Amino acid sequence: MKTKRFLSCLAALCLTGALLWGLTWLTQKKDSYAKHAEFFEQRADYDVFFVGSSRPMNGIFPMELWENYGIVSYNWAQAGHPPPAYYWVMRLALDYKQPKLMVIDCYGMHFDAKTTGVFGLMHISMDNFPLSLTKIRAVRDMLDDPSMTEEYNEGERRSAFNLLWTFPVFHSRWNQLTQEDYRPIRNY
């Protein structure tokens, strides 16, 4: 009897987990995955990674480097990112590829905050990386700042839980879902 009850509970937990995983996948915004799909699809290593804020994001063009110099590069820069945020994006990217060179934007060294004022930008940078020990460390470090736990205008509470599991953030997107949301994510 105990074995049957244990197996029933285990099956219920597995079904609940699968349902939550599917709902999370369906309701989350796919912009992070779309933006960084090529990074995960690239088979060979990159020559150069660029990390930083809007300056390298808007001023460095990997395709130009490829066409003009044969340099394979990837631009991880994100608008509004202070150095701690792009440090962790760099660490997460290094779990997948090993470039010969890292170019780091030093513009924001004078900022005190560990994350951007617009928390949605953190989702664009972090959501595309699968859950890992490095991602957990990154989220814990970036949110280890009292000013980052406040609720901001966009309404999302700044919590590690919301960056590690996106369903609580995007669960109300039902009326915004499109055909694109039902298609598989290429790099996940």
Where are these regions (language model features)?
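Acidic/glycine-enriched edge-of-secondary-structure segments
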Residues: 19-28, 72-80
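Alpha-helical transmembrane signal-anchor/signal-peptide segments
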Residues: 26-46
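Membrane-embedded segments
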Residues: 51, 55-145
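Hydrophobic membrane-insertion alpha-helices, especially the h-region
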Residues: 4-25
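Secreted/periplasmic serine-hydrolase-like ester/acetyl group-modifying domain
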Residues: 119-188
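Short N-terminal helix-initiation segments at or just after the protein's N-terminus
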Residues: 12-14, 42-50
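A broad, low-specificity signal for short, low-complexity segments enriched in glycine/proline
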Residues: 7-14, 33-38, 62-68
